[in-house]
Amino acid sequence: LVDLADNPSRGTAMPQHRPFAILLISGSALIALAGCSASDAATSQAASTGASSAQPVVVELFQSQGCSSCPPANADLNAIAGRSDILALSFAVTYWDRLGWKDTFGSPRFTARQQDYANAGRGEVATPEFIVNGTYAVLGSNRTALGSAIARAGAGHGAPAISASGSDIRIERGAAGAPATVWLVRYDPNTRAVPIRAGENGGRTLLHRNIVRELTRLGDWSGSATTFPLAPARESGLASAVLIQRGTGGPIVAARKL
């Protein structure tokens, strides 16, 4: 577990370990975990939530290749990444980079997103950490709590419909309340095996799926039907999704895989 984020606008602090029990596994055991434990704890519970591809439960994982506690959480996310009723997103933070290994997918923007959640009272800046629907913060080693949070999140009620056509994203009318932020997320849906050559995970090969590569703020939505331009991705082979989120680090009121 690591406290405090490295962000140009917020200063830096060295990661600090806190003691807690966690199982570290690798190789075939990691793959077995992805297929069994996470399925029992998180995936099966999500099946009864009523969520769908048109309004999935959003599960964000904040992790780092430099964090020895993160591989089991990565495996849990990988296990649910293919579900149509869940939008699983893996954000690589940067505050571990100075401890021997620079994360190959890390971005200060992703670190700042986790800090925004902490500032909004949703957990603390720590790795690994899950945030479910922008509302529930879950310690990344607690698979049972992750499954419970996914089940509590359920399907969105009264959320606006989101669609994409050609080069546009359209959000239909809905009850917005306060203006909400519209985010475009581009992520890699493939499983990537990354050899780690230094740091706490040095000598291991970590499996990543649904790694976020782009996070773009499209604008605000206030309840009326709105259209935003959909620019091409900077990388080929990326999947896209839209999030509608209240405030900074607030609840996610709607989401759609495009």
Predicted regions and their residues:
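Short, Lys/Arg-enriched N-terminal segments with co-localized hydrophobic residues
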Residues: 1-13
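Bacterial N-terminal signal peptides that target proteins for export
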Residues: 15-26
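C-terminal motif of bacterial Sec signal peptides marking the signal peptidase cleavage site
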Residues: 33-35
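Bacterial signal peptide processing site
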Residues: 37-39
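Local sequence-structure signature of Cys/Sec-based thiol-disulfide redox active-site neighborhoods
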Residues: 51-91
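Thiol-based oxidoreductase modules, predominantly thioredoxin-like and allied folds used
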Residues: 85-111, 124
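Short, conserved sequence motifs used for protein processing/export or organelle targeting and
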Residues: 104-123, 127, 135-258
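Ligand-binding face of N-terminal immunoglobulin V-set domains in extracellular IgSF glycoproteins
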Residues: 130
